C-alpha cells in the first residue's frame, strides 16, 4: 500500500531476535512481493542485488552495513547474516559492485554506517564511499545516524551520507527523500525534504517551510 518495492535488511537490528527471525523476515517480504538485499541465509544470498529494469536501463541496489553489534551477525558462506562493509570484510561487497557494473547496471549502494546523531560523516564513511565508487557504484545512500549528514561528489558520483529517519519515533524531525533518475550515463537528482514525527512523515511543499528547513 505504501508503494515500497524493495528494502535493505543490512542494519544493526536485523538479528535482534536471532537468525530464525531474520529468515522469517525474508520469507514475509517474499510473500508480500517486496524485494530485499543486504542479508540472507548465507553470504551469497546477502550480497545479491535487487535489480530493476525500465526502458532498457538496469539499476542494481546492493545493501550492506558497517554497524554490526556482534561479529557473528555477518553473513558467511555457511551462516545467515548481513553483508558486512568493515574494512576487513568489504571485499565481497566491492566484488558485487564491480560485477553489477560490468553487467552494464547502474549501481546504488545502500549502506548502514556512521555515528548516531552526529551530523558529520566519519572519515571511514568518506573512505568507504570512495572505494564503492572506484569499484563501479554510481550512487551511495547512507543510513543509521538518524540525522541528515552532508552530500559529497566523488568522480562525479553523488554520496548521501545520511538521509535521517523516514519513519521513526524520534525527537529529530528533519528527513529527506532522494529521487534519482538514470538516463544513459546521466543521473538527475531531486531532493524532497520532509518532517518525521510520531511515526508519520510529511513531505514539505510550502516554499516557506522548505526555506526554514534548509536554514
Task: Please tell me what each predicted stretch does.
Residues 1-215:
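Acidic, metal/ion-coordinating pockets
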